[in-house]
Amino acid sequence: MSDVLSQYKGCSVRDLPTPNFVINEEKFDKNCTTMLNNVEKLSQECGVPIKFRAHVKTHKTAKGTLKQLGHGLPLAKRTTRAILVSTLKEAEELLNYQDRQCSDYIDDITYSLPCCVPEFIPLLSNLSRRVNNFQVFVDNIEHLENLKNFGRPASGKKWSVFIKVDMGTKRAGLAFDSPEFLSLLKKLTSSEIKEVIEPYGFYAHAGHSYSSTSINDTQNLLMEEVKAVNSAAKVLCSVDPQFDPSKLTLSVGATPTSNSLKLDNKSTLVKFITTQLVSTLEIHCGNYCMYDLQQVATGCVQDHELSGFVLGTVLSSYPSRGELLSNTGVMCLTREASSIKGFGICADLEHVLKSESFSREWYVARVSQEHGILRPIRNWNETTPLKLGSKIAVLPQHACITMGQFPYYFVVNSEGIVNDVWLPFQKW
């Protein structure tokens, strides 16, 4: 990436090739700072330690991860050393980067896919040697059997496991009040399993919070997450009365539910944490550093808070049908959607770089492989025309998926000047 940076450093965003992905570093920094400070404020209001674990899956970069951890953010009131990864490659490459920098800003990694099967356990074992704290997900009795049969990981410690709690999305995990969950905990507390495995805590993710339409809705869902993991911990204590629940970490969050921490009135949450929570609370989330239209649709953030966009070019015009052609097709925008229509909202480059509201006039209505068809949000005759050859910023529906389509990201300041290029640790 040094060649790309040397070629484009100092250039204006208007001079960059398209399509490409651009990150506004000042907005990225502000988003990271805000989330860290919201968690810190909750901790102070409750008078108890509350952890934060940054999910790095959206951008998958070393420099972006450092910011999520609180480094280089002068206004951040806390830092963290704990991350969540969606692939083993993310973890390995971040640790490789850390080794090259002779630093240890990460010392706690959780792998978020329940994959304790023979194919992956040796890989998980090797990774356990490289970090002080490493957790894996389990949601199946066979996962426990597989770990037991493998034996302790290469770290020499016991396997540290998060039990995944299903919040009703039926993606992964078990409902805390299900017979399967009870059976899993009975197996977890059996003497043969205890020799090689220990519970780290319970993990819940309200994926359905992405369908929320107000921040008050997401606050209610955050309460549901907290209550679910707390109930899960109580089930464990009922199975093993000798177990001390204060040793557990109860990890909850999604970007929409975590964003509800910005609300001034958190009295119900604070009261529950201070009077009923049996273990240490941890907040986790990842998309917040970037944001996207799916997050805007939840009512928790504004479009000018998005820190990234796809840079495209207007290629042709079809006034008779009221459409334009751009090079922002499915290969760079994907087919993700939300309650906001289309596959992306177009914005003027001057406006999208500022931290203030801007008007929406065009959106990406249809996509094929390399073709993006733009339509006006209102009437063609009432919309500011876009000249052929002009550059546009397209706000993506889902940043995590969209960013996966690009080999690197141009990082610009609020004036649109390139100051860095970030390389993502993509694929597997």
Swiss-Prot record:
Regulation of this protein's activity per its record: Sodium cyanoborohydride, N-ethylmaleimide, hydroxylamine, phenyhydrazin and EDTA are inhibitors of the catalytic activity.
A biological-process GO annotation: D-serine catabolic process
Pfam families named in the record: Ala_racemase_N (PF01168), D-ser_dehydrat (PF14031)
SMART domains reported in the protein's UniProt record: D-ser_dehydrat
Reactions catalysed, as given in the entry: D-serine = pyruvate + NH4(+)
Protein family according to the UniProt entry: Belongs to the DSD1 family.
Protein name, entry field: D-serine dehydratase
Cofactor names: pyridoxal 5'-phosphate; Zn(2+)
Record GO terms (molecular function): D-serine ammonia-lyase activity; metal ion binding
Function: Catalyzes the conversion of D-serine to pyruvate and ammonia. May play a role in D-serine detoxification.
Species of provenance: Saccharomyces cerevisiae (strain ATCC 204508 / S288c) (Baker's yeast)
Binding-site residues, Zn(2+): 398, 400
Gene giving rise to this polypeptide: DSD1
Record: residues binding pyridoxal 5'-phosphate: 203, 210, 255, 286-287
pH dependence comment: Optimum pH is 8.0.
Keywords: Detoxification, Lyase, Metal-binding, Pyridoxal phosphate, Zinc
Residue positions, PTM N6-(pyridoxal phosphate)lysine: 57
Quaternary context: Homodimer.
EC number per UniProt: 4.3.1.18
